[in-house]
Amino acid sequence: QMDMENYRLYPDPAATKLVKALAAEYGVSDKQVFVGVGSDDVIAMSFLTFFNSDKPVLFPDVSYSFYDVWADLFKIPYERPMLDENFNIKPEDYMRTNGGIVFPNPNAPTGVYLELDNVRKILDANRDVIVIVDEAYIDFGGKSALTLLDEYDNLLVVRTYSKSRSMAGLRIGYAIGG
């Protein structure tokens, strides 16, 4: 229930109530949760924060179209490993020198889900860089990488309320990491 008096106030910039609610929902500390103005904002802030070396960031050649937009905007070098003939991410293509990794799971626009064993292979081979798993469509199928947070401090899972919850207008995006 909203008090009409609150409409005149600016929102809490830290989104404290939302952060605490998300932390409680996922069983993590509120220090592990970052909230942004939609997942695009969260991904952009993550690019600025974590992808700042001269090494290329890796993301699939067929994938969410804003990854290269953010990389170009922020002058971050990147490479786009090709999907296989069935539109699968090939984990071995992400086992090379890089400045970070980001991929959607399930992939957008292909809808192909990368099994957690393969996500784990990518994480194991890249312990010195941040690996962002963009789970905008995870509620439509597959297991979340959130179950891997206790094992990998280099994992950042990004989610949104825009897709499966049909709340795009609220602009709620968030990241959970170690």
Roles of regions detected by a PLM:
Residues Q1-D40, M45:
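N-terminal small-domain helix-loop-helix segment of the aminotransferase-like
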Residues N6, S63-Y64, M82-F87, Y137, ...:
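Short, acidic/turn-prone active-site loops that include or flank metal/cofactor-
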Residues T16, T49-P104:
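PLP-dependent aminotransferase-like
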Residues S29-V33, D54-P56, E135, D153-N154:
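Short acidic capping loops at alpha-helix termini that bridge into adjacent secondary structure
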Residues S39-D40, Y64, N105-T110, K163:
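Short glycine-rich anion-binding loops that position phosphate/pyrophosphate groups of nucleotides
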Residues E79, D84-D139:
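Active-site phosphate-binding strand-loop segment of PLP-dependent enzymes
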Residues E151-G178:
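Active-site PLP attachment segment
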